[in-house]
């Protein structure tokens, strides 16, 4: 432009000199927000159709604009859009290309709309789609866990506290613990959807608009549950993204804990499970290695998602109402976190059905470490011995077993009675790990029958 104004800027009328070239690159977001194009165009089509219906712009112009937007969408679908930092973001790219196709009438599209409510709408549409994909992926992983638990519901393994053998449980019970964690994750995402699914469009820059919009019809077209009812709030907050990141972070924490156990259990020091070869890699120098790369990567990627949550929280904490350019920085963190979560869910969903528990190793480990000591204490309590006294008695018996180098079921009845004469011959029935496991039949317990009941309920929940 001969007058030195910013070339091609839809906001350039106010300015007397072009934007600094590095500032264009520094402030552009097209490298990462291009993914919003379908949501942006969908929102624009719904907005434009409403402008025509309301008589705010001529119906013929609305139809031309919508046809042009559909053409732009097709071009981007086919990879024909050429991106430029000069156009800043996907919203400007779409409008600029629309202008090239249909001419100045394209400028009517932005009537009664700001990039502030436009971006907020696009972001919510995008996150809604991602949320729906995430909850479906959670269900897939839950299904894999349930099938694995059902197949190995009877397999006895050690349960740990402080990384020490505590009480025997079943492999199925352990897998169902992760099912329950994921069930709550599913609930968190589902619970937030109604809060996410509110439409900001029509709020304009911050104060609303003087045009007679029909926001409700646009909301219905875009499948929103309702409207953002305060224009300042609609364009100013990103709590919906923060809530999404918090749910993602919690989900990833659960996947990380599962990953940690898979890494330990597959190590030669444990040999509790075998991971499928297709989800492991080898070493460039040590030919014997089978490395659990998938769980390790999932465990490592948690930091990215935690970082995204912290990033958006920190970004928003000091911003006065309404929109500030700082808020552009929410997208990259959120996009990366969502991509990471979906990838981790997918790879776990594919890997989990192929996990092979090593039954004999697990059973042997379950019997070590005096894991039935609590059962012995419970046995004494049933003889009307106060639990604290029973605890002391069993502690003495454990020390005796340690000194003899045997487990509890390796002690003779005479050994046991030398500590407390109230112990009788029926004690042998409760010292095996099988008895310990199957005695825990209360809801939530690890008895095989109880676990199978939990599995049946889970299959009903998942419609398996």
Swiss-Prot record:
GO terms for cellular component: cytosol. Keywords: Amino-acid biosynthesis, Arginine biosynthesis, Cytoplasm, Lyase. GO terms for molecular function: argininosuccinate lyase activity. Pathway: Amino-acid biosynthesis; L-arginine biosynthesis; L-arginine from L-ornithine and carbamoyl phosphate: step 3/3. Its EC number is 4.3.2.1. Its main location: cytoplasm. InterPro entries: Arg_succ_lyase_C (IPR029419), Argininosuccinate_lyase (IPR009049), Fumarase/histidase_N (IPR024083), Fumarate_lyase_CS (IPR020557), Fumarate_lyase_fam (IPR000362), Fumarate_lyase_N (IPR022761), L-Aspartase-like (IPR008948). It is found in: Cytoplasm. PROSITE patterns: FUMARATE_LYASES. It catalyses: 2-(N(omega)-L-arginino)succinate = fumarate + L-arginine. GO terms for biological process: arginine biosynthetic process via ornithine; L-arginine biosynthetic process. Belongs to the lyase 1 family. Argininosuccinate lyase subfamily. PANTHER family: ARGININOSUCCINATE LYASE (PTHR43814:SF1). This is Argininosuccinate lyase. It comes from Magnetococcus marinus (strain ATCC BAA-1437 / JCM 17883 / MC-1). The lineage of its organism: Bacteria, Pseudomonadati, Pseudomonadota, Alphaproteobacteria, Magnetococcales. The gene is argH.
